[in-house]
Amino acid sequence: MNTIKKQIEWDKYIIALSPIFLIFYISNETYAIDYRAFYLAGKSVLNNLNPYLNHISLSSDFYGPINSELSKFSGWKYPPLASYFFTPLATLPYELSKNIFNLFSLLSISLVTFFIIKKRIFHLNPYSLIIVGISFPFLATISRGQVEILIVCIALISLYFYKQDKIFLSAALIAIMGFIKVFPLLLSL
């Protein structure tokens, strides 16, 4: 009986994760239309303003492609507490804030991928990671500055804690997901 575990070939996975540098470059060069809404909501909270209303009449810093000059509403469609999550990033200039958010998104998905490989939760083909990394849905999610990657990472960590019988931690992470976006709460029912 062979009790020797198969070694993980890390060199293949490191090469497979190389599109992250391309993705970060692309995210640096794009406007991140969806992230702009998060940024403006955080900026509104910092200025004691309602994140759901358009404040462009107060300052051009509140301009976003969604709210423009004519709209009464800002385009913010997330729970009120989500705007508080983005207040630290709203203290920074938009470009720097956007890049930090995208870096955090890329690091979180990389760490979850590393965790899956390390714990051998299931087998990931290294070459499939390259395909996913350069696929249009993934690139579009990053270039627009969407929060779905963070939501998926939090959901996977929550599932891991649930499998480890750490129900409180799992439930707390699901609650955090609900503060950012309501839809994951519906899935957890």
Label every PLM stretch briefly.
Residues 109, 147-156, 178, 182-185:
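Hydrophobic core segments of transmembrane alpha-helices in multi-pass, intramembrane catalytic enzymes
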Residues 7-117, 140:
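TM-lumen/periplasm interface segments of multi-pass membrane proteins
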Residues 79, 139-152:
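Membrane-interface micro-motifs in multi-pass membrane enzymes
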Residues 168-189:
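Membrane-interface alpha helices of multi-pass inner-membrane proteins
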Residues 148, 158-169:
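Membrane-interface transmembrane helices that cradle and orient dolichyl/undecaprenyl
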Residues 103, 130-133, 157, 172-179:
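Residue-level signature of the transmembrane alpha-helical core
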Residues 116, 125-138, 142:
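Transmembrane and membrane-interface helices of multi-pass
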Residues 112-127, 164:
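Transmembrane alpha-helical segments of multipass membrane enzymes and assembly factors
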